[in-house]
């Protein structure tokens, strides 16, 4: 691209015609922009100029006499800056004829904005460096202000060219050098500007898959949505044939909001997706409704995927595109939100002991209800960006009552190799309401029968806190309860008082409750979820059953709005209770709601008890052995 005159060694002539080909801008050696490109012309050559050593380089003001008044300002302002920036090696050369800059005017105008952006970025990174006289001359004249929509940002910041910044008063996303945004996570949340790619239905319970398969499901969902969304750059360049089992796990895609720039708000309570154009909330997933999240994997560096349940999409994998290396930052923030939520519980367990915040879909088939992570005892997640809200110890199809009270999610901010990994440290903590210390995960099957604290098989029920110990409850039942069916009780339920604390329960209450239930016509004994739903025909139908997978759990199954609801009646302390009241027994609860025509409220939905399904209608039920 440069030619040296063979007839004379006194100077070096630059032929403008050689620069007519603009393809040189794509060569690798010109892709790096350095501060040396705007320094003095003699700085790059220790021995002076390349041409005549005895001559001194002509100053830039000498350009003015050779040019018209209008062109002199433009050339001195634009041409030297663009030329020296794009071709750093030309900084050490002396131009034989300054008038040739007129020929480069058109070429420089095309690259003017790029060079200014890079120079602006370099000056931001080195603010203490004094400007040379040549650089000051390059900026003479009324230089236009850089467009804020095109100024480059650091990798962990928001990309203004893809999504506008949050409005005033909103917390800006943190960078990796900043401290943990605890005040934002505990408050309104931390905002990230990302691109929503859509979601794809997850048909199979994630609980039944090991960690490797769950990662394959996430990556396959990312690949499918990248192929379906126009303009998406696929994370996996070489598309491999999907594994056969993925066809049974992933279902249809929902591209209603795909390709939309959204604001992701991460807090200790939920993940919120908001459209930046019209401030419409696309989705609001409570923390307990999220199965697991992954981000920053080697093959999906620009994407964050999380599986959540909501009434619209049911169980679905939602994909977010995070450019400029923001994916690892987003998944780390989500992990910190999990950790902070657990710490909140440790400080005030009475407020969170039975708190249920998620709104999930009821009535799904029994093998599809609980995609709660790490249900295999002793199984630990591999490294690679997997985090989970629902790590549990029990190898059953039910989740732990409070997802954060029986587990400890460890965040490892100092370990770069595990920056996106959140491991289960549940063996170090002691579950509330269990009178015996846990020796480890090996003894978790002993907890299966008596210490399941979920109020719903399908966890939708909002519950509060326990009141009294089951020891006194079991001791007073024999004298306080009348003989016969407890349906005839007219006693008002006990109201839950705020600030009441839970005391250790007693396993003696469970046989006592089972014996009482055998006297009830609506109690069907051990009955699976699917079998119970087949008996529910009309709205208002209900029955009481004992869980097949978790003996000792007594469930009220009812039909409301065509959907089956499953309410766990007895808490870990042996109390029969709802959100606001504590009842003497199951019959007392049913009679109270039927006589007063009151619904059982469950996370905004209602369950009304109208027609009991009697056990004699279930021909497969055998009489109890006494």
UniProtKB/Swiss-Prot annotation:
Q: Where is this region: CH2?
A: 1-185
Boundaries of every SH2 domain copy = 522-613
The record's subcellular location field reads: Postsynaptic cell membrane
Q: Where is the PID domain?
A: 186-369
Please list where the region (CH1) is annotated. 370-521
Annotated region (Disordered), positions in chain: 38-76, 119-182
Transcription as a keyword? no
Gene3D superfamilies xrefs = Pleckstrin-homology domain (PH domain)/Phosphotyrosine-binding domain (PTB), SH2 domain
UniProt record, GO biological process: apoptotic process; intracellular signal transduction; positive regulation of cell population proliferation; regulation of gene expression; stem cell differentiation
Q: Name one Pfam family in it.
A: SH2
- GO cellular component terms listed in the entry, alphabetical order: postsynaptic membrane
- Is the keyword Disulfide bond in the record? no
User: InterPro entries this protein is in?
Assistant: CEP152/SHC-Transforming, PH-like_dom_sf, PID_Shc-like, PTB/PI_dom, SH2, SH2_dom_sf, SHC_SH2
Query: Which stretches does UniProt call biased (Polar residues)?
Result: 120-139
Outline the subunit composition.
Interacts (via PID domain) with phosphorylated MUSK (via NPXY motif); undergoes tyrosine phosphorylation downstream of activated MUSK. Interacts with GRB2; the interaction is dependent of Tyr-422 phosphorylation and increased by EGF.
Q: What is this protein called?
A: SHC-transforming protein 4
Provide the species name.
Answer: Mus musculus (Mouse)
